[in-house]
Amino acid sequence: MWVLILLLAGMPPVLCIDISMHPDAFGVVGKSIKLKCSFTSSYPISDIVAVDWTYRQLNGGSTVTILHFQNKPYPILEGPFKDRIIWEGDVRRGDASISLTDLRLTDNGTLSCIVWNPPDVHGNVPQTKLTVTIENLFFQFNTVILLSALVFIPSALVSLLLLIRMRRSINRGRTKNLKWRKKSPIEESQDCVYDDNENTPLHPTLPQEQSPGCFMKFCLRCLDDSDED
């Protein structure tokens, strides 16, 4: 309705610049983190486009500007992020991102990205909550265990397969040797069976209950003959 009234009155409407940031960012002490800020404007990006990054501590306090950009970045010379801010943006592409280096636990707080592109100077002011923590030793320990498992388990499986193949090869060799091994005369005599009616040895396959061998039967016959005498 107001846009229609302004158009009818011959006045150009005031459009808002749209700025986007991720609501949360998580960093680790001593590491770096990139804080993304993107924007779109209803007007072409001009040479006088300006960006301000502000910071407020988590426990409250005043909001301070930590970086100002206009044609080039101007980081703060004093304050919590002195010498730890890097401009990562490209305003021509609607990017106003920065990076924070050497994070500290005292960096926890809220950061905002504000962009002006005259005459488009009105817009939302989003915020990112920065949370910095000490790297979890438990996570490091789990990572070491995982990497060790990825190396050990395949090696153990390969070793097990090799042992199984070696055992099967040894068993096949033993079976082959037993099959082709020549029996001694004593073993041959134990395999033969005497016919009770004849003195000639027979060589059929042994029954389930093994009968006395030839030599043993001959000895038994000798004992029987001596008893009769």
Curated annotation (Swiss-Prot):
<dbReference type="GO" id="GO:0007155">
    <property type="term" value="P:cell adhesion"/>
</dbReference>
<feature type="topological domain" description="Extracellular">
    <location>
        <begin position="17"/>
        <end position="143"/>
    </location>
</feature>
<keyword id="KW-1015">Disulfide bond</keyword>
<dbReference type="InterPro" id="IPR000920">
    <property type="entry name" value="Myelin_P0-rel"/>
</dbReference>
<dbReference type="InterPro" id="IPR007110">
    <property type="entry name" value="Ig-like_dom"/>
</dbReference>
<feature type="glycosylation site" description="N-linked (GlcNAc...) asparagine">
    <location>
        <position position="108"/>
    </location>
</feature>
<keyword id="KW-0732">Signal</keyword>
<dbReference type="InterPro" id="IPR013783">
    <property type="entry name" value="Ig-like_fold"/>
</dbReference>
<comment type="function">
    <text>Mediates homophilic cell-cell adhesion.</text>
</comment>
<keyword id="KW-0812">Transmembrane</keyword>
<feature type="signal peptide">
    <location>
        <begin position="1"/>
        <end position="16"/>
    </location>
</feature>
<protein>
    <recommendedName>
        <fullName>Myelin protein zero-like protein 3</fullName>
    </recommendedName>
</protein>
<keyword id="KW-0393">Immunoglobulin domain</keyword>
<comment type="similarity">
    <text>Belongs to the myelin P0 protein family.</text>
</comment>
<keyword id="KW-0325">Glycoprotein</keyword>
<feature type="domain" description="Ig-like V-type">
    <location>
        <begin position="17"/>
        <end position="131"/>
    </location>
</feature>
<dbReference type="Pfam" id="PF07686">
    <property type="entry name" value="V-set"/>
</dbReference>
<dbReference type="InterPro" id="IPR036179">
    <property type="entry name" value="Ig-like_dom_sf"/>
</dbReference>
<keyword id="KW-0130">Cell adhesion</keyword>
<dbReference type="InterPro" id="IPR013106">
    <property type="entry name" value="Ig_V-set"/>
</dbReference>
<feature type="topological domain" description="Cytoplasmic">
    <location>
        <begin position="165"/>
        <end position="229"/>
    </location>
</feature>
<dbReference type="InterPro" id="IPR003599">
    <property type="entry name" value="Ig_sub"/>
</dbReference>
<feature type="transmembrane region" description="Helical">
    <location>
        <begin position="144"/>
        <end position="164"/>
    </location>
</feature>
<keyword id="KW-0472">Membrane</keyword>
<dbReference type="GO" id="GO:0005886">
    <property type="term" value="C:plasma membrane"/>
</dbReference>
<feature type="disulfide bond">
    <location>
        <begin position="37"/>
        <end position="113"/>
    </location>
</feature>
<keyword id="KW-1133">Transmembrane helix</keyword>
